[in-house]
Curated annotation (Swiss-Prot):
PANTHER family noted in UniProt: 30S RIBOSOMAL PROTEIN S16, SMALL RIBOSOMAL SUBUNIT PROTEIN BS16M
Biological process according to GO: translation
Keyword set includes Chloroplast: yes
A Pfam family it matches: Ribosomal_S16
Protein name, UniProt field: Small ribosomal subunit protein bS16c
Name of the gene: rps16
Disulfide bridges in this chain: none
Length: 79
């Protein structure tokens, strides 16, 4: 099952995340199927490729709870 989830990168104590599509059984920093954005919780900077996200969600990809909240804040998902 494919999931839309966060992949950590950055330095120690300075996390930054990429929004990626990957198998649910793949480890957190494993190889993604596709990268659709990024999020930096320290600077609150984020970018989401709306076209790719909508495409993957239409294919049935499930976002994790954290990613769902991020997309809801950026008005990409309506409840």
């Amino acid at each position: 099952m494919l999931k839309l989830r966060l992949k950590r990168n950055g330095r120690k104590r300075q996390p930054a995340y990429r929004l990626v599509i990957m198998e649910s059984t793949t480890r957190r920093n494993g190889r993604p199927v596709d990268e659709v954005g990024y999020y930096n919780p320290i600077t609150k900077e984020s970018y989401f490729n709306k076209e790719k996200i909508v495409k993957w969600l239409s294919y049935g990809v499930q976002p994790t709870e954290t990613v769902f909240q991020l997309l809801k804040k950026s008005n990409l998902i309506e409840i």
